[in-house]
């Protein structure tokens, strides 16, 4: 019998509340399938939060007539475009799980500094009201990816120095047009990078544990 929508929501919430194992061999051990399920759920949640925040910022501060031209100018703005990471699902399927985990970790870690300023910028919105927890959510996903890497690491050379730059902090001066455009660009990159990390994790989960949700 198929699970009801309510049961599915409860299961997803329960998985999000599960802690990561602190070390390999910890008892009781969490199955690899659960590690992947947790990581995917956390990445999906962060990606959706980033997308909602981007849209709300856009509606609040960016005139509709300027959005298209600004979005085109943002194409080469993201530092993550300088690393040899897959740009979509098809390319991701050509990479090993270890490579995808390393790229995911790099993307997440590049935002740990900037997002600490997010709550200082956005204070008057239901969406922005959750921004003070984004850092905690990113750290949680970082720990989950590191747990997966401990399980799958094959001893091959690490890729931890590929992304030497991180992103600038968000600008709190919302009366400045330059600051608004900077924040708009940062939110665009944040959304794109979390979409990449989510895609990589879903590709890995689907090819290891074939399931109906693999079509994305």
UniProtKB/Swiss-Prot annotation:
The signal peptide stretch is 1-26
Mind listing the GO biological process terms from this record? Answer: animal organ development; cellular response to insulin stimulus; growth hormone receptor signaling pathway; positive regulation of multicellular organism growth; positive regulation of receptor signaling pathway via JAK-STAT; response to food; response to nutrient levels
The keyword Phosphoprotein is assigned to this record:
yes
A GO term for molecular function: growth factor activity
InterPro entries on file: 4_helix_cytokine-like_core, Somatotropin, Somatotropin/Prolactin, Somatotropin_CS
The UniProt annotation places Zn(2+) binding at 45, 198
Say yes or no: keyword Cell division present.
no
Which keywords label this protein?
Answer: Disulfide bond, Hormone, Metal-binding, Phosphoprotein, Secreted, Signal, Zinc
Q: Which CDD domains match?
A: somatotropin_like (cd10285)
This chain's function reads: Plays an important role in growth control. Its major role in stimulating body growth is to stimulate the liver and other tissues to secrete IGF1. It stimulates both the differentiation and proliferation of myoblasts. It also stimulates amino acid uptake and protein synthesis in muscle and other tissues.
Name-wise, this protein is Somatotropin
